[in-house]
């Protein structure tokens, strides 16, 4: 018999015993009661009483009602020490036969298993080892767990199981719970920041007839009643800018985007984005906003402007570096013989790209080639927080052209740890220029670029009504959560990530 078969046999045997216990509970009446009400969380009790002297705590005779999942139990004759875990932390229970009604210790507490959810009433005291504990006087089994905790609660280490059965991961791993608490604080902090700045939170369509706002491959679905193909949105940008045209001059949205692309440690097909738009601002204002926001999040979540990620350490209290895409490519490509002149001539850029092993697509112009060279030689060097600016107009179809050099745009991308975190720009509000750029995207799509943008005629009409000078930015919530939680994979910060079917 294999080791796996032995484990399955043991599991089946343990589950059979637990089901028999549940059957006995059903025979007594309601096996899943719902009238117990706790009045305290474990962490709140620790915060308030861990530093309290044991004798003083005993004299105060503080009565509490707590509830949670049994994580450990240690029987000592007529008493049992039990550790329960609630949403905040863990706390120890002292359950003694003499402190409970007759028969309860043997008939009820004696049948409890690891993983069961219980509610108790009792008074706080300190053990000889100075551990805050609840001396129980009333107990109630609230939920009988039919399956045991993972590996007798030695921890859930199988990554595949952690992602597929996140509930087990959250029960077993304190670090995972901390990660998702941080993620929640990131979202709450962003919302608080923008509301405090006078922005209005809005919701725009997730199902779109024309997917726009980004260069990506969309998911396609079909609306039966309307008999029309629709797309899960790849970005909310064009709808948000319509709102600015309509007079909502400061808007933001925190919501899902969907892109039918690969899955990796940095990519999930369903992900969360912040997008915001501010009238009478430019991309410099947005870079300032971003620095301020990330600094605020670090202080609120971590208590410091120092953010540690893997082997790196970032100080969000310092100004972020700002460098153009062309300058970064020359700076980090110098050891590969790249000079400035290679990036301003099509033939030289194409030859440079091919020398680097880049497969140049027929539909690419100079801007796309230069961007590919940047990604090859420079992107991974942008470790410290860096705003990469002045992207080629060819790869920035929605961004405003730069006044001094119309071949590039007033655009930036934020890189931290060699990864893109955000993307923003002064918005293109010239309807005729936008129409021409959409046409160029259509031509690229017809030439085989399946990530080129669709043309949105109605958006052009909206621009013809007049979009005030505006700047907008998108920030990846998942990647921000990875950063603040020091999580190596995007799957570690998404509760239920996309997984290949078994």
From Swiss-Prot:
Catalytic activity: tRNA(Lys) + L-lysine + ATP = L-lysyl-tRNA(Lys) + AMP + diphosphate
Origin: domain of life: Bacteria
EC number(s) from the headed UniProt entry: 6.1.1.6
InterPro entries named in the record: Aa-tRNA-synt_II (IPR004364), aa-tRNA-synth_II (IPR006195), aa-tRNA-synth_II/BPL/LPL (IPR045864), Lys-tRNA-ligase_II (IPR002313), Lys-tRNA-ligase_II_bac/euk (IPR034762), Lys-tRNA-ligase_II_N (IPR044136), Lys-tRNA-synth_II_C (IPR018149), NA-bd_OB-fold (IPR012340)
Residues annotated to bind Mg(2+) 2: 420
Subcellular location per the Swiss-Prot or TrEMBL entry: Cytoplasm
Residues annotated as transmembrane: none
UniProt binding sites for Mg(2+) 1: 413, 420
Pfam family, one: tRNA_anti-codon
UniProt keyword annotation of Cell cycle present: no
Cofactor note: Binds 3 Mg(2+) ions per subunit.
One Gene Ontology MF term: tRNA binding
CDD domains: LysRS_core, LysRS_N
Swiss-Prot/TrEMBL GO biological process terms: lysyl-tRNA aminoacylation
Keywords linked to the UniProt accession: Aminoacyl-tRNA synthetase, ATP-binding, Cytoplasm, Ligase, Magnesium, Metal-binding, Nucleotide-binding, Protein biosynthesis
PROSITE patterns: AA_TRNA_LIGASE_II
Cofactor requirements of the protein: Mg(2+)
Complex and partners: Homodimer.
Matches recorded under NCBIfam families: lysS_bact (TIGR00499), PRK00484.1 (NF001756)
Entry's family note: Belongs to the class-II aminoacyl-tRNA synthetase family.
The protein's name in its UniProt record: Lysine--tRNA ligase
Species this protein is from: Haemophilus influenzae (strain 86-028NP)
């Amino acid at each position: 018999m294999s080791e796996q078969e032995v484990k399955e046999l043991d599991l089946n045997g343990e589950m059979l015993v637990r089901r028999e216990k549940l059957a006995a509970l059903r025979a007594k009446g309601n096996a899943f009661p719902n009238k117990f009400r706790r009045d305290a969380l474990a962490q709140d009790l620790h915060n308030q009483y861990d530093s309290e002297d044991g004798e003083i705590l005993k004299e105060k005779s503080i009565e509490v009602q707590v509830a949670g999942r049994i994580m450990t139990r240690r029987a000592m004759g007529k008493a049992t020490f039990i550790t329960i875990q609630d949403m905040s932390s863990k706390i120890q229970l002292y359950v003694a036969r003499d402190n409970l009604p007759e028969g309860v210790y043997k008939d009820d507490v004696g049948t409890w298993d690891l993983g069961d959810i219980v509610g108790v009433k009792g008074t706080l005291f300190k053990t000889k080892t100075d551990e805050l504990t609840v001396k129980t006087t009333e107990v109630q089994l609230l939920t009988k767990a039919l399956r045991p905790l993972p590996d007798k609660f030695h921890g859930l280490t199988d990554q595949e199981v952690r992602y597929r059965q996140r509930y087990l991961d959250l029960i077993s791993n304190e670090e995972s719970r901390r990660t998702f608490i941080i993620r929640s604080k990131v979202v709450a902090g962003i919302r608080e920041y923008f509301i405090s700045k006078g922005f209005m939170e809005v919701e725009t369509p997730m199902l779109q007839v024309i997917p726009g706002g980004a260069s990506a491959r969309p998911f396609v679905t079909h609306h039966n009643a309307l008999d029309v193909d629709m797309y899960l949105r790849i970005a909310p940008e064009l709808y948000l800018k319509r709102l600015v045209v309509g007079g909502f001059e400061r808007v933001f949205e925190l919501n899902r985007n969907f892109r039918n692309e690969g899955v990796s440690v940095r990519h999930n097909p369903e992900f969360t984005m912040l997008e915001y738009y501010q009238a009478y601002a430019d991309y410099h204002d947005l870079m300032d906003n971003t620095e301020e926001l990330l600094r605020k999040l670090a202080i609120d979540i971590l208590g410091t402007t120092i953010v540690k990620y893997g082997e790196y350490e970032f100080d969000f209290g310092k100004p972020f570096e700002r460098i153009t895409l062309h300058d970064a490519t020359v700076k980090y490509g110098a050891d590969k013989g790249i000079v400035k002149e290679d990036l301003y001539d099509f033939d030289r850029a194409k030859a440079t790209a091919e020398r680097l092993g880049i497969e140049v697509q027929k539909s690419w112009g100079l801007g796309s080639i230069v961007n590919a060279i940047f990604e090859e030689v420079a992107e991974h060097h942008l470790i410290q927080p860096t705003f990469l600016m002045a992207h080629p107009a060819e790869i920035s179809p929605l961004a405003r052209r730069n006044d001094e050099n119309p071949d590039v745009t007033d655009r930036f991308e934020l890189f931290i740890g060699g990864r893109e975190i955000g993307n923003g720009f002064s918005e293109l509000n010239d309807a005729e220029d936008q129409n021409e750029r959409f046409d160029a995207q259509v031509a690229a799509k017809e030439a085989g670029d399946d990530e080129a943008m669709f043309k949105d005629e109605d958006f052009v009409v909206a621009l013809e009504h007049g979009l005030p000078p505006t700047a907008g930015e998108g920030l990846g919530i998942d990647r921000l959560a990875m950063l603040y939680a020091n999580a190596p994979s995007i799957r570690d910060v998404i509760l239920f990530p996309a997984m290949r079917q078994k």
